[in-house]
Each structure stands twice: as structure tokens, then as C-alpha cells.
Amino acid sequence: IKMQLSKNLALAEVTRSETAKRKGISNMPTPEHLENFKKLAENVFQPIREHFGVPIHISSGYRSAALNKAIGGAGKTVNGVYIPSSQHCTGEAIDIDMDGTSITNRQIFDFIKDNLTWDQLIFEFGTEENPDWVHVSYESTGKQRKQILKAVKKGGATSYVPYK
């Protein structure tokens, strides 16, 4: 399906997944999730794209429940039914990774933090100066938590601590 979510963001960019392709997993959003992605594109992605004036690389966008489970994304199994808790599964989150470009992940993180409306912003691993990637979400109902976290490894497991 050829569709633009915003001027510079195509649906294909947020649904692309090597894991889904390899495992034959469908990764098409529902109409509701598509509407959520349009809000994220308008309020977060497009302002980033226009500010920096270069293509913005999305390393992870939409994830169907099956894809989220396959990659070990946030979720749990209740009575044998997998329930994803990641905002990637509702069309409300993207991960941005600008490695190999003239823009750093830190520049993206700081621009979002200081200039945009967002729900959750995560400085994903990396060094004190630069995250490995940036996770950002936009709550489709408009109720933004403005939660800033840092992902860290503790004893081999990922945990999220308040960003300072």
C-alpha cells in the first residue's frame, strides 16, 4: 500500500521490518493505528524532518503484536494470550537512529525534548553524550505524559531510569 503519513513519511517506512519479512509476519496497522501514526507523523516526525532538513531514519516503527513478540518487545502473556504493551503496536511510537549521517542521535533527542509535544522520550543506551537510538511516542488522545527515560543494562536486563 502506497500511502504518505506526512509530507516526508511513507507508510512503508514505518512498517518495514526484516524480522517480519524473514518470519512471514504481517505488519500492517489497523485503521485506528494508521490514524495514530498520522498524528505522530504530523506532531513529531515532520517537525524533526523540517528542522534538520535531511532524511530521518526510522529504525523501528509499527509492530504488529506478532512482530513485537518475535523481537522481544514490551508485552506479557496472560492465560496463554500475548498482550503487547509497546506503543509501537498502537502506531504511537518510532525509534530514530541517525548513525552514519551528519546529525547525531543526541541532536534529535534534544530537539524533541526542547521543541515538540510528545508522550515518552527515551535516551536508548549509548554513552552519556549520545544514545544508540531515540525512542519517541505521541499519545493519540493528546494526553502526553512528557516522560523522559534512559535505557540502561542491569545484570543483562534492560531497565528504564529517569533521565537527568
Each language-model region and where it sits:
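Extended, low-complexity, intrinsically disordered C-terminal regulatory tails
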Residues: 42-76
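Active-site-adjacent substructure of cysteine-protease-like catalytic cores
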Residues: 63-90, 110
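Catalytic cores and adjacent binding grooves of peptidoglycan-active enzymes
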Residues: 84-85, 90, 98-164
